[in-house]
Amino acid sequence: MRPSNRTPAQTRPITITRSFTAHAEGSVLVEFGDTKVLCTASFTEGVPRFLKGQGQGWVTAEYGMLPRSTHSRMDREAARGKQSGRTQEIQRLIGRALRAAVDMKLLGENTIVIDCDVIQADGGTRTAAITGACVALVDALNWARGKGIIKANPLKFLIAAVSVGIYKGEAISDLEYIEDSAAETDMNVVMTETGKIIEIQGTAEGEPFSHEELLELLVLAKNSIREIVDVQKAALS
Amino acid sequence: MRPSNRTPAQTRPITITRSFTAHAEGSVLVEFGDTKVLCTASFTEGVPRFLKGQGQGWVTAEYGMLPRSTHSRMDREAARGKQSGRTQEIQRLIGRALRAAVDMKLLGENTIVIDCDVIQADGGTRTAAITGACVALVDALNWARGKGIIKANPLKFLIAAVSVGIYKGEAISDLEYIEDSAAETDMNVVMTETGKIIEIQGTAEGEPFSHEELLELLVLAKNSIREIVDVQKAALS
Amino acid sequence: MRPSNRTPAQTRPITITRSFTAHAEGSVLVEFGDTKVLCTASFTEGVPRFLKGQGQGWVTAEYGMLPRSTHSRMDREAARGKQSGRTQEIQRLIGRALRAAVDMKLLGENTIVIDCDVIQADGGTRTAAITGACVALVDALNWARGKGIIKANPLKFLIAAVSVGIYKGEAISDLEYIEDSAAETDMNVVMTETGKIIEIQGTAEGEPFSHEELLELLVLAKNSIREIVDVQKAALS
Amino acid sequence: MRPSNRTPAQTRPITITRSFTAHAEGSVLVEFGDTKVLCTASFTEGVPRFLKGQGQGWVTAEYGMLPRSTHSRMDREAARGKQSGRTQEIQRLIGRALRAAVDMKLLGENTIVIDCDVIQADGGTRTAAITGACVALVDALNWARGKGIIKANPLKFLIAAVSVGIYKGEAISDLEYIEDSAAETDMNVVMTETGKIIEIQGTAEGEPFSHEELLELLVLAKNSIREIVDVQKAALS
Amino acid sequence: MRPSNRTPAQTRPITITRSFTAHAEGSVLVEFGDTKVLCTASFTEGVPRFLKGQGQGWVTAEYGMLPRSTHSRMDREAARGKQSGRTQEIQRLIGRALRAAVDMKLLGENTIVIDCDVIQADGGTRTAAITGACVALVDALNWARGKGIIKANPLKFLIAAVSVGIYKGEAISDLEYIEDSAAETDMNVVMTETGKIIEIQGTAEGEPFSHEELLELLVLAKNSIREIVDVQKAALS
Amino acid sequence: MRPSNRTPAQTRPITITRSFTAHAEGSVLVEFGDTKVLCTASFTEGVPRFLKGQGQGWVTAEYGMLPRSTHSRMDREAARGKQSGRTQEIQRLIGRALRAAVDMKLLGENTIVIDCDVIQADGGTRTAAITGACVALVDALNWARGKGIIKANPLKFLIAAVSVGIYKGEAISDLEYIEDSAAETDMNVVMTETGKIIEIQGTAEGEPFSHEELLELLVLAKNSIREIVDVQKAALS
């Protein structure tokens, strides 16, 4: 029934490659099937002006798509001179989610910028990005601990994300592009490694959905995220 | 317990004033307590280029805050030369929600732009905006039917929105600013007049939240939205 | 003869509502007939860099129109990414006029920003804005004196403004939109409460005008401004 | 008494050099003493979209200062990415003034763009620009008549401009920079060759001014403009 | 003597991976040692407006660096709102070089956009980009021929590029970052597969260089490019 | 054979006028035939932030074309809100070339900005700009030495530039516009007064060129630059 013959609850093959590029303190290529996102974590000492002198750190994220990561070429945002509303919405989501996973006091007056650049898109880029970014964040934190810049581990828990939705009347997990573009309802869920909710964003693309459907989607998301966290842990071990 | 002595489930006084300004096809001042948003609906014939010739209409929204609608003055976005990520995120939410309420085929090749401008902010501006924008939309649709530009009523149902959250460990509805800035969890919910979900966006500002808390918030939102729809209906009658 | 049946020298009903919104140190809704402008004055300690250490203050203004304050919807300047030349011309005029009314030494190293946002436009928005902004300025100065931030009153005199013009061959005062768009000559005058000139900007939209016509317009402006100042004084008392 | 030993009514030496550059249909270097502005008129067939099919033409102007036309270097507007409010205010003034001199019906569906670029600044750049632009406009109109693109002469009258002001308590004409920066009142006047008013913009930089002072300044302006028109006519003959 | 122990004439290991991503008509990852650039060629029917109806095609290029492709993080150009001068200079160079390799008449009214995005930077990104872009271009042309969109092969010859320079007094080929940043002279050379020159850009970073040094660098470049073309041909066969 | 009847090696008449405008520390009008560029050098104490405290100076350049310096009017870059890629490429070239001529240690913590504004264009504007800018630079350096701001002369050597190219199969020097637009190969060369190379940028506009053609062009450039340096020296003496 699904174009890929997956069962409703089945995610795509998920792989996480650490140290994908050389310079960043954390550099992860995350793949959810044909969706491939490069997540780099850049650690710098110091914080933005609005946080100076408060003894706490900052984590933020930026998101971009390579112009031909998509089926037809998109305009390059740098050439157009501004980031789209979609881009801003996504990078705000990624940043919020990562900040929830970090104890800012333990991070001290240091900043981590996570860049999530989509190399190839096939649906679910924002949830793949959060999943990969969390691993890059861990690597950057470990780098800083190895350097003695921070003492205790600021990571409160791993976070991971998945998209779920209602497609042809059925709740499915980890939608690929052709499912996503035909879905009646689309929901992105970010959870901790213990299944608590960090962020939930559900949208009725077609018909409004009921509380029952919402609950069904949540269960699906929780199960998928448990599997995804296992992939994160395997990559980190 | 709440700064305003409201019960957890109690919304602020909500008023909807139609025909607040003279030129727009729909013009509504919506007030959720001290949050005041002017929502105007502008009806024009024709659609954006990407929809031409498809026999369907378009609904979109823009959002702004007057520089001193807030406690301390914010920079004017027109002077800075760009809209913030927050602004774009909100106006995309408003637009999506309103489009869910309209049958685009019945709208025909016509466009409605909803401008939501915050005159005074005290938390919940985006949910107030959606609530007021829906009434302005109805007025603009009725205007167009009165002019004979559209035949059947494209409105599928009324929509309304409320913010709910966990504040000092308790689930409360319709957060005002001091509650919102201290909330552990913040959730914006958009529903139809019959209580189906259009959009749900929940964020753990502090600690991650559980499924039980999510359910509790949803019930609170559903009840509040039922009341808010009654205010919409009273204003429209 | 005038669309509103006013006599040539007659202004529209002018009302000034103080404390229109809650947060600003001065907040005034000024109405010249159907033209409605919200003027807020924001008082902050400190001055822009170019004035630091000179023992004097700064007053500046920004102007905007809500997209549907006009007959047909205008593009939102924040979305277009820049303020129009008209907007900049008007806000420079408002700022210059207000600075003329303030003793910058007595203001001390403090800044007042006046935001003039047009809620509904029917001609004469810039002169209404100056008139309302002056009252908001007074409120902000009084607020600062009440707080003990400034000692002596920096206000040198009240200022007010009106548009005058030649319409169907006759000099008239306080043009509304349909008069304004058909006027042969359009002149905006800003004066002190004692009738001295702060700014005069006259433009031949159609035929060039003579010195005699200029003088006639000035007399008209002086008389109208005297009345408008009375409204300001009544609002402030 | 004046830094240049001029009498109050005396303008600086004014020269107008036509055909200063090779490519433009009209190209004029205008000098008011040490203020030097290059004014080029570019004639193109066709009109902007908002005028299409109405059988009339369009005249507009743009203004710029070379970065080191001034005493200390100004930022290049092209590098900063926007034109200042002052620039926009000035180019709007120049455009309005020139449009007043042209019969748009006789111009037909053709456009003239006047570029006024300040090579060297010593006060009065906008009035010098208007004066030179008018001559460049005449050359471009004659070029188009020579080509047979337009039949009748669309020029209604020559226009010229001068700045006048109150300096050390006395009304003076054609202020140079050090006078301008110390003037209590500054007024720019644009008139037709027969002394009718096209535009008047007077600002109290220091103290408000009286009607008597305004009249005195107007007389001064009228006399100076009469002389300046003579220079235009000599250059054109 | 070289940090990598290469001989002066020795290039880094060069690899070209085709079909690196799925959507583009040509997609190549090119590696010059640790410099890695993703080059995608997007083929679309139609040409930009300035070429319409002339029976010829268009080839253009855009260039970007991922923010953390470099040792320390660079600002994201999309977030800053503009491309740097360096970026524009490089993408203009890539576009010119590729256009020299294509017969625009045989391409017909079709457009190819080449996006060169630097995944990891270690010197020579622009020459690596040209080398990889040429292979992506060939793939896109073959794709279009396979589809029957174009008949004859528009490729005139392969092109490839290398950077050469004078480092510690000696002419060397294919500079890596630490050589590049210390080089006295830096020269980028683009040649055809038969060794004719498409573009040469040489800059004295330290001391001016002599004609003899220029010749020596050219010989070095020619030899390296011959080797690089062999890598291109092997990748394409 | 050349449109101007020049011999292949013959440059256009070249004139250099110093002190062309009044305010700049160096102000030069350079003319290569009908190409006229105003080059001003602005000397200011202090350096940009990235150089602070390093005991060395900075030289940079900006380039612009007046909108009607060209055959048909170009958009004003300040109005469009950004500099074109071509503009940025050229001003980067000018800046690099001038920095090669200055000993930054001897300049001390001072900055020189060179503005090159094209008054009239007929090919070769960037090489004319470099030639004129060098003379303006010398004047600014001498001004600073006269003021005692710098002690020793930071100028290492004069630099000058010329464009050469292959036109109708023959190597020619100092191309004017109609030659430039038809040239098969176009090369800009910047040299020191002793004939060493500062920058060489050669582009095959049509067919790729051979090493022999490159050498021929270089000889031509060297001879022309020797003559141009003589004009510089004559102007400076």
Swiss-Prot record, chains A, B, C, D, E, F:
Molecular-function GO term, any one: tRNA binding
EC supergroup of this enzyme: transferase
Keyword Nucleotidyltransferase: yes
GO biological process: rRNA catabolic process; rRNA processing; tRNA processing
SUPFAM superfamilies found in the cross-reference section: Ribonuclease PH domain 2-like, Ribosomal protein S5 domain 2-like
EC number assigned by the record: 2.7.7.56
Domain of life: Bacteria
Keyword tRNA-binding: yes
Pfam families (UniProt xref): RNase_PH (PF01138), RNase_PH_C (PF03725)
Keywords: Nucleotidyltransferase, RNA-binding, rRNA processing, Transferase, tRNA processing, tRNA-binding
Reactions catalysed according to its record: tRNA(n+1) + phosphate = tRNA(n) + a ribonucleoside 5'-diphosphate
Binding site for phosphate: R86, G124, T125, R126
Record's subunit section: Homohexameric ring arranged as a trimer of dimers.
Family affiliation: Belongs to the RNase PH family.
NCBIfam families per UniProt: RNasePH (TIGR01966)
Its biological purpose: Phosphorolytic 3'-5' exoribonuclease that plays an important role in tRNA 3'-end maturation. Removes nucleotide residues following the 3'-CCA terminus of tRNAs; can also add nucleotides to the ends of RNA molecules by using nucleoside diphosphates as substrates, but this may not be physiologically important. Probably plays a role in initiation of 16S rRNA degradation (leading to ribosome degradation) during starvation.
UniProt protein name: Ribonuclease PH
Source species: Shewanella frigidimarina (strain NCIMB 400)
Taxonomic lineage of the native organism: Bacteria, Pseudomonadati, Pseudomonadota, Gammaproteobacteria, Alteromonadales
Gene name linked to the record: rph
